[in-house]
Amino acid sequence: MKLNELRDNPGARPKSKRLGRGIGSGKGKTSGKGVKGQKAREGVSLNGFEGGQLPIYRRLPKRGFNNVNRKDYAPLNVGTLAALIESGKIDAGQKITEATLRAAGVYAGSKLAGVRLLGRGEISQKVEIEVSGASASAIAAIEQAGGSVTTTVARAEPASA
């Protein structure tokens, strides 16, 4: 068998029924749309219209909002950082900054506010890294390997009750 000899199984793609071609076809005259009315006309019925019943988007209360000041950070796991160092994309001997990470192709996009270091994976190399943010487990992993983490964005501590 060759690629140019491949065929569908018989009946795998049934031909669609042609509409409005006589009463003998089973879909003649009104083409399965019933008689008159809004839904029999050309075009689609109104989205969200429930026949006069109060629609669900008006029955339920408004919730939440989109924060225009929200900042998104590119995630970078410790294991990924170790792999980048081993592959030679990043030099562990020099201080690693967000500019270094961007040049190495770790993240791109002007909408991201920076990099957040996360703790998944393991690292054995001693590195000095400066990122926007870091999780406690990531800082512990880097410091256990003899390195240091500097964060440029201060994280607010939760208010104690």
Curated annotation (Swiss-Prot):
Record field: compositional bias (Gly residues): 21-35
Claim: Ribosomal protein is one of the keywords in the record: yes
GO process terms (BP): translation
Gene3D superfamilies for the chain: 3.100.10.10
Residue ranges of the region described as Disordered: 1-42
Subunit relationships: Part of the 50S ribosomal subunit.
GO molecular function annotations of the record: rRNA binding; structural constituent of ribosome
Similarity-based family: Belongs to the universal ribosomal protein uL15 family.
Keywords: Ribonucleoprotein, Ribosomal protein, RNA-binding, rRNA-binding
Protein name: Large ribosomal subunit protein uL15
InterPro entries on file: Ribosomal_uL15, Ribosomal_uL15/eL18, Ribosomal_uL15/eL18_sf, Ribosomal_uL15_bac-type, Ribosomal_uL15_CS
